[in-house]
Structure formats: structure tokens, C-alpha cells
From Swiss-Prot:
SUPFAM superfamilies: Scorpion toxin-like. Beta toxins bind voltage-independently at site-4 of sodium channels (Nav) and shift the voltage of activation toward more negative potentials thereby affecting sodium channel activation and promoting spontaneous and repetitive firing. Has the structural arrangement of an alpha-helix connected to antiparallel beta-sheets by disulfide bonds (CS-alpha/beta). This is Toxin To6. Residues 1-20 form the signal peptide. Residues 21-83 form the LCN-type CS-alpha/beta domain. Keywords: Disulfide bond, Ion channel impairing toxin, Neurotoxin, Secreted, Signal, Toxin, Voltage-gated sodium channel impairing toxin. Expressed by the venom gland. One of its GO terms (molecular function) is sodium channel regulator activity. It comes from Tityus obscurus. It is found in: Secreted. The keyword Secreted applies. Disulfide bonds join 32-82, 36-59, 42-64, 46-66. InterPro entries: LCN-type_CS_alpha_beta_dom, Scorpion_toxin-like_sf.
Length: 85
């Protein structure tokens, strides 16, 4: 039995992972991963960040959740986490 199909499958699974245009982590299973300690801003960001909505302002995945980051951490050039502007 060859291990090639197993390795190929693992590589293809890895290709599903990536980053949204705003620099936040993005995965096929949860388009609403957000680094933010503030729940209100987290929900706002979930609706407004690139790749997180269905075009109507609704999250593709309702299981939106937040991660804390160190103060001042830049997730994308010129943008701080939890900055809605």
C-alpha cells in the first residue's frame, strides 16, 4: 500500500487553510475567526471584514468567536485588532 494518496490528501487539506484579505486567520470551516477581546466589536468585525459575510451582512458561519491578542499587536499593516475603521 502506497502512502502517496495519504500525503496528497494531507497536502490538499492544508490548502484549505489561509488568510482573509485583512490578515486575520481564515479557514474553510469557520470564516469568522477574529482576534478581539471585545464581544461587541467582534460581532461588528465578523459582519464587515473581508470574506466573513454572505453579501447581506450576515456571517457565513454563526459560530463567530474571538481570541485575545497582546495590546498593540498589528494583524495587518496599519490595522490593529478590534479597530472597526
Amino acid at each position: 500500500m502506497s502512502i502517496f494518496p495519504i500525503i496528497l490528501a494531507l497536502l490538499l487539506i492544508g490548502l484549505d487553510e489561509g488568510e482573509a484579505l485583512d490578515g486575520y486567520p481564515l479557514s474553510k470551516n469557520n470564516y469568522c475567526k477574529i482576534y478581539c477581546p471585545d464581544e461587541k466589536v467582534c460581532k461588528w468585525s465578523c459582519k464587515h471584514r473581508a470574506g466573513a459575510t454572505n453579501g447581506k451582512g450576515d456571517c457565513i458561519n454563526k459560530g463567530c468567536y474571538c481570541y485575545d491578542v497582546a495590546p498593540g499587536t498589528e494583524m495587518y499593516p496599519g490595522r490593529l485588532p478590534c479597530n472597526p475603521y
